[in-house]
């Protein structure tokens, strides 16, 4: 599944986690190590640029964090990022440069690349969102199957048994997810793809495409 590889989904120059991600082939392989990597990386961040607040939390001095936001352990918030009113960052999150975490949005065990946005009523868990990826209002990522079984990544007749119980979605660079959509566990969306509002998405969606529904995925012209 070449289209699911990290190198084909993301421009690694657009994240502080570049060296970490380069060690892996597929994005779901990194999920178990995000928290430990944040602790390691945080200790090396320049003190003249970052404030350490709480347990293993580093916030760039140029970031804007609203007083009502909650930030749990093991987090790095990058330059110019905006953490808005009542956002809930549970733990293990890297928020990239100029990224936005919005009102009533919840994050957990997630990497947001630079300039990515989850600005309005979103849930993002066990996921990676690429450069300039954007989730519309009320769109959520489901990271656990209803029967609690291990997640399989499926693309037509191809499949990869991950051996992992919780995987959200992997959004490539410049992905746009329409309002009110649900990305089911293990969804992979290729670069520059648009998802129509109110969609229920699963499996691997090709890059440079428009997802209208499960039976209508067209290439961008």
Question: Where does each model-flagged region fall?
Answer:
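Terminal amphipathic alpha-helical/low-complexity segments used for targeting or macromolecular assembly
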Residues: 1-56, 192, 198, 207-221
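Glycine-rich hexapeptide-repeat left-handed beta-helix
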Residues: 17-21, 109-114, 119-221
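Conserved hydrophobic/aromatic pocket- or pore-lining residues that grip, position, or stack substrates
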Residues: 26, 81, 110
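Glycine-rich adenosyl-nucleotide cofactor-binding module
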Residues: 47-60, 95, 99, 112
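Glycine-rich beta-solenoid repeat tracts in large extracellular/virion proteins
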Residues: 51, 70-71, 88-89, 106-108, ...
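ABC ATPase A-loop
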Residues: 52, 58, 76, 94, ...
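Short loop/turn microsegments at loop-to-beta-strand junctions
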Residues: 54-55, 60, 72-73, 91, ...
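Glycine-rich active-site/cofactor-binding loop and its immediate structural neighborhood
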Residues: 59-104
């Amino acid at each position: 599944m070449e289209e699911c590889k990290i190198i084909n989904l993301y421009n690694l120059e657009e994240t502080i986690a570049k060296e970490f991600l380069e060690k892996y082939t597929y994005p779901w392989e990194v999920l178990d190590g995000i928290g430990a990597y944040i602790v390691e990386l945080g200790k090396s961040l320049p003190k003249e640029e970052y404030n350490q607040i709480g347990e293993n939390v580093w916030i760039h001095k140029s970031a804007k964090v609203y007083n009502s936001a909650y930030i749990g352990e093991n987090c790095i918030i990058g330059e110019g990022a905006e953490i808005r009113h009542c956002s809930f960052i549970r733990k293990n999150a890297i928020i990239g440069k100029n990224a936005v975490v919005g009102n009533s949005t919840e994050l957990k065990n997630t990497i947001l690349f630079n300039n990515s946005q989850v600005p309005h009523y979103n849930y993002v868990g066990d996921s990676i969102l690429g450069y300039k990826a954007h989730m519309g209002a009320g769109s959520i990522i489901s990271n656990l199957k209803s029967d609690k079984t291990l997640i399989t990544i499926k693309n037509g007749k191809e499949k990869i048994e991950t051996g992992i119980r919780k995987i959200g979605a992997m959004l490539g660079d410049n992905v746009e997810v329409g309002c009110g959509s649900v990305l089911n566990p293990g969804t992979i969306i290729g670069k520059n793809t648009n998802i129509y509002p109110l969609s229920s998405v699963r499996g691997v969606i090709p890059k440079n495409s428009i997802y209208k529904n499960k039976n209508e995925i067209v290439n961008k012209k």
